[in-house]
Swiss-Prot record:
GO terms for molecular function: ATP binding; sulfate adenylyltransferase (ATP) activity. One of its GO terms (biological process) is sulfate assimilation. InterPro entries: PAPS_reduct_dom, Rossmann-like_a/b/a_fold, SO4_adenylTrfase_ssu, Sulfate_adenylyltrnsfr_sub2. Its EC number is 2.7.7.4. CDD domains: Sulfate_adenylyltransferase_2. Coiled coil: none annotated. It catalyses: sulfate + ATP + H(+) = adenosine 5'-phosphosulfate + diphosphate. This is Sulfate adenylyltransferase subunit 2. Pathway: Sulfur metabolism; hydrogen sulfide biosynthesis; sulfite from sulfate: step 1/3. GO terms for cellular component: sulfate adenylyltransferase complex (ATP). Heterodimer composed of CysD, the smaller subunit, and CysN. Stimulated by an intrinsic GTPase (Probably CysN). Belongs to the PAPS reductase family. CysD subfamily. It comes from Escherichia coli (strain K12).
Length: 302
């Protein structure tokens, strides 16, 4: 990795640390949304750097759907314990009582009830006025036009036509009671930046990002990894072992794997150099309806 690239990564690192410190100083009750993915791992690493040698001045929040990969749950608990972080886990009790799941109710309803409503419940329960998220502008078009400080009204809704100007590194965090801000310290990072920084800083990640033989089946053009026994096979479906990895992680029935032989970080970085598709191509929730992500964000999704 040449000096120019190192400088670029250090500039991104400095910007993100500045944003994290700014929020911690400006808001009374911030929280870091922790989805267990690679971006969350980088964001947590940056937060620990921002306040080293002290501890994080805010908790981590995982909005659990009950459908994450088992390796994600194991990684979450291990990471929180290793770093001494306060970890809050919230699962929508109404959704649990209704038995909401992606197979029976579909991705849109599952995401709305278990993720969007679950997140709003948690933010209201603890009274958080700022929430860090690991979203990046290069991931998806609605995120590309969102500010680093993303204003949300008292119902946690986002209005893309009512965003605040951000001149240089000056951010407007003024809010009224009941309103909040979603903050995205990784907005200017790319997927390639994330992977190079993970390699440079030796950041621990969920093993699912690395290629291995895993049990998968093809459904609706997606390679679905079978993580437990909560699936009913459709006629003609066969579970096969294939060499796959994940570019993005979410609920296992809604997250497609990609065929790959990249078993190390340098191999992933090399693979990304020739990739022509978005990492979120395997996320069903991004395409379950027209303008899917923007509609979800307007309703309160992160």
């Amino acid at each position: 990795m040449d000096q120019i690239r190192l400088t670029h990564l250090r500039q991104l690192e400095a910007e993100s640390i500045h944003i994290i410190r700014e929020v911690a100083a400006e808001f009374s009750n911030p929280v870091m949304l922790y989805s267990i993915g690679k971006d969350s791992s980088v964001m947590l690493h940056l937060a620990r750097k921002a306040f080293y040698p002290g501890t994080l001045p805010f908790p981590l929040l995982h909005v659990d759907t009950g459908w994450k990969f088992r390796e994600m749950y194991e990684f979450r608990d291990r990471t929180a314990k290793a770093y001494g972080c306060e970890l809050l886990v919230h699962k929508n009790p109404e959704g649990v009582a209704m038995g909401i799941n992606p197979f029976v109710h579909g991705s849109a309803k599952h995401t709305d009830i278990m993720k969007t409503e679950g997140l709003k419940q948690a933010l209201n329960k603890y009274g958080f006025d700022a929430a860090f998220g690991g979203a990046r502008r290069d991931e998806e078009k609605s995120r590309a036009k969102e500010r680093i400080y993303s204003f949300r009204d008292r119902f946690h809704r986002w209005d893309p036509k009512n965003q605040r100007p951000e001149l240089w590194h000056n951010y407007n965090g003024q809010i009224n009671k009941g309103e909040s801000i979603r903050v995205f310290p990784l907005s200017n990072w790319t997927e390639q930046d994330i992977w190079q920084y993970i390699w440079l800083e030796n950041i621990d990640i969920v093993p699912l990002y690395l290629a291995a033989e895993r049990p998968v089946l093809e459904r609706d053009g997606m390679l679905m990894m079978i993580d437990d026994n909560r699936i009913d096979l459709q006629p003609g479906e066969v579970i096969k072992k294939r060499m796959v990895r994940f570019r993005t992680l979410g609920c296992w029935p809604l997250t497609g794997a990609v065929e790959s032989n990249a078993q190390t970080l340098p191999e992933i970085i090399e693979e990304m150099l020739v990739s022509t598709t978005s990492e979120r191509q395997g996320r069903v929730i991004d395409r379950d309806q027209a303008g899917s992500m923007e509609l979800k964000k307007r309703q309160g999704y992160f």
